From Swiss-Prot:
The gene is rpsP. GO terms for molecular function: structural constituent of ribosome. Keywords: Ribonucleoprotein, Ribosomal protein. Gene3D superfamilies: 3.30.1320.10. It holds the Pfam family Ribosomal_S16. It comes from the Bacteria. It comes from Acetivibrio thermocellus (strain ATCC 27405 / DSM 1237 / JCM 9322 / NBRC 103400 / NCIMB 10682 / NRRL B-4536 / VPI 7372) (Clostridium thermocellum). One of its GO terms (cellular component) is cytoplasm. InterPro entries: Ribosomal_bS16, Ribosomal_bS16_CS, Ribosomal_bS16_dom_sf. GO terms for biological process: translation. This is Small ribosomal subunit protein bS16.
Amino acid sequence: MAVKIRLKRMGAKKRPFYRVVVADSRYPRDGRFIEEIGTYNPLTEPSEIKIDTEKAQKWLKNGAQPTDTVRALLKKVGVIS
């Protein structure tokens, strides 16, 4: 099972809000997921990023691959260098 840490789009049209989730790479973007580890709101100034660092580190240690966007968010929060 190829596990990814990626963004799940929520919110209304033109008002995106994202959940940072751990999901099998074969599932659709907004489909089933294994665990929610945080949220990301790009509409606030500055962008609001809330990520459970312990859960994120656990999944990264277990081999989950973050997408490019999530990797940038994890660097901002300080989970990865």
